[in-house]
Amino acid sequence: MLMLLVRGTHYENLRSKVVLPTPLAGRSTETFVSEFPGPDTGIRWRRSDEALRVNVGGVRRQLSARALARFPGTRLGRLHAAASEEQARRLCDDYDEAAREFYFDRHPGFFLSLLHFYRTGHLHVLDELCVFAFGQEADYWGLGENALAACCRARYLERRLTQPHAWDEDSDTPSSVDPCPDEISDVQRELARYGAARCGRLRRRLWLTMENPGYSLPSKLFSCVSISVVLASIAAMCIHSLPEYQAREAAAAVAAVAAGRSPEGVRDDPVLRRLEYFCIAWFSFEVSSRLLLAPSTRNFFCHPLNLIDIVSVLPFYLTLLAGVALGDQGGKEFGHLGKVVQVFRLMRIFRVLKLARHSTGLRSLGATLKHSYREVGILLLYLAVGVSVFSGVAYTAEKEEDVGFNTIPACWWWGTVSMTTVGYGDVVPVTVAGKLAASGCILGGILVVALPITIIFNKFSHFYRRQKALEAAVRNSNHREFEDLLSSVDGVSEASLETSGETSQEGRSADLESQAPSEPPHPQRY
């Protein structure tokens, strides 16, 4: 179009821009407005009754103009009512002029639910999308929470207000049970630390042998020996508490004190003492080996299982230090040394926790307690309130009777064993009011304890299935696959592993584009 610059007054309307010439001096010119049509006058780029052809993530459909006119505020409704092609292109990702088709790079599953919304006027929640992804899709297509159907609105709002967790107790799908990619990347990052270390390949093999029982046959043998030593240590501790051993050691201790010698040298049975030394030597070997072979010393001391290993050998060495510190101060200090040694020996009970390294159930229990501190706190709060209330009622009803309800603190023990439905029977009410209070305490305990226990059990089931899936993945992988994994991280720096997430994400996006669904011969119409 030829454009002329004319000096004069400019007027602009919706159709065209008209320039009125300025009248020359001395001449009277009648002012008029041009009536010629603009370039788009009477010519629409789309017919108002034309069906809208869309392609969402490879899913092609045709939507009728009547269905879109019912919801003009949605993105497709605004696209249908667009006055120009330029305005329509701002609402979509791409436009095919030849096929007159609009393309959207969005979730195709939500688009099918969107088609159902244009038919019925109600939007239903998709289980395949999390609540936040579903909300983002709904906002993109111009749908608010009012568009949700009544059957899905309450569930959607509840999940949206609930803080997201790394697990879902109601889900048994492989995606929720299988190990997440973060765990695999953490293992690769730990293995990559050996790349620049001295004797890194040998240290890496030894570390996998000690940490992963399914790595090789020597790792399985090492795990069996470790379990046997832990069980032997626990058995020796239990046998040491038998009456015949206690009487024999007490007589030997009295004779040693009378002779002015330390009772610790003759207190233990020789066989049990040798077994204890062997167990301590094995535990010390495990701790020192894991510390020397660990890829990161800081991470070593932050791992709960490693802390348990340290606590299992700590009482023995503390006992030796106490003996060295108090051994030269005379027989009067031997009594204090014996008390200190008894306290340290009580810490040997923590050796049973070493089995958690070889037990799926114990590791799952630890993960459950770690993620259930709120539920455990609620359970303790419920029990504390119930015990306080029913203890006061029982004290009021039984204080005149000589049955053990003399004070309210004395009634706390009865309230605890009653609410937890243990019922030792050492203290029981005898009056009618006391028995009614006991009945209410027992029934209240059943109801109160059952509420958080269900949530904790669901979490335990989830973590147990997840741990079993991780062990199965390691067990099913053969030795050659482990060799490939080890060789793949040789020379790989930790920084490259941190940036690998972005590269893998781009690769997955490219794969999704290359695996787009095939085009149907004729798109369906709605």
From Swiss-Prot:
- Subunit organization: Heterotetramer with KCNB1. Heterotetramer with KCNB2. Does not form homomultimers.
Primary subcellular site in the record, as a coarse category: membrane
UniProt intramembrane stretches: 409-420, 421-428
The record describes the protein's role as: Potassium channel regulatory subunit that modulate the delayed rectifier voltage-gated potassium channel activity of KCNB1 and KCNB2 by altering their kinetics, expression levels, and shifting the half-inactivation potential to more polarized values. While it does not form functional channels on its own, it can form functional heterotetrameric channels with KCNB1 and KCNB2. Each regulatory subunit has unique regulatory properties that can lead to extensive inhibition, significant changes in kinetics, and/or substantial shifts in the voltage dependencies of the inactivation process.
UniProt lists the family membership as follows: Belongs to the potassium channel family. S (TC 1.A.1.2) subfamily. Kv9.1/KCNS1 sub-subfamily.
- Membrane-spanning ranges: 218-239, 271-293, 305-322, 338-358, 374-395, 436-464
Q: State the annotated membrane topology for this chain.
A: Multi-pass membrane protein
Keyword Iron-sulfur included in the entry's annotation: no
Q: Enumerate the subcellular locations listed in this protein's record, separating them with semicolons.
A: Cell membrane
Q: Does the keyword GTP-binding apply?
A: no
Region listing for Disordered, in residue ranges: 492-526
What are the annotated GO cellular component locations? membrane; perinuclear region of cytoplasm; plasma membrane; voltage-gated potassium channel complex
Report the source organism. Answer: Gorilla gorilla gorilla
> Which ranges are annotated Polar residues under compositional bias?
496-507
- UniProt short sequence motif Selectivity filter, positions renumbered to this chain: 421-426
Q: Which domain of life is it from?
A: Eukaryota
Alphabetically, the GO molecular function entries are: potassium channel regulator activity; voltage-gated potassium channel activity
Q: What is known of its domains?
A: The transmembrane segment S4 functions as a voltage-sensor and is characterized by a series of positively charged amino acids at every third position. Channel opening and closing is effected by a conformation change that affects the position and orientation of the voltage-sensor paddle formed by S3 and S4 within the membrane. A transmembrane electric field that is positive inside would push the positively charged S4 segment outwards, thereby opening the pore, while a field that is negative inside would pull the S4 segment inwards and close the pore.
Identify the Pfam families for this entry.
Answer: BTB_2, Ion_trans
Cytoplasmic side residue ranges read 1-217, 294-304, 359-373, 465-526
Q: Which UniProt keywords apply?
A: Cell membrane, Ion channel, Ion transport, Membrane, Potassium, Potassium channel, Potassium transport, Transmembrane, Transmembrane helix, Transport, Voltage-gated channel
Q: Which GO terms describe its biological process?
A: action potential; potassium ion transmembrane transport; potassium ion transport; protein homooligomerization; regulation of potassium ion transmembrane transport
Q: Which Gene3D superfamilies match?
A: 1.10.287.70, Potassium Channel Kv1.1, Chain A, Voltage-gated potassium channels. Chain C
Any idea what this protein is called?
A: Delayed-rectifier potassium channel regulatory subunit KCNS1
Please give the residue ranges for the topological domain Extracellular.
240-270, 323-337, 396-408, 429-435
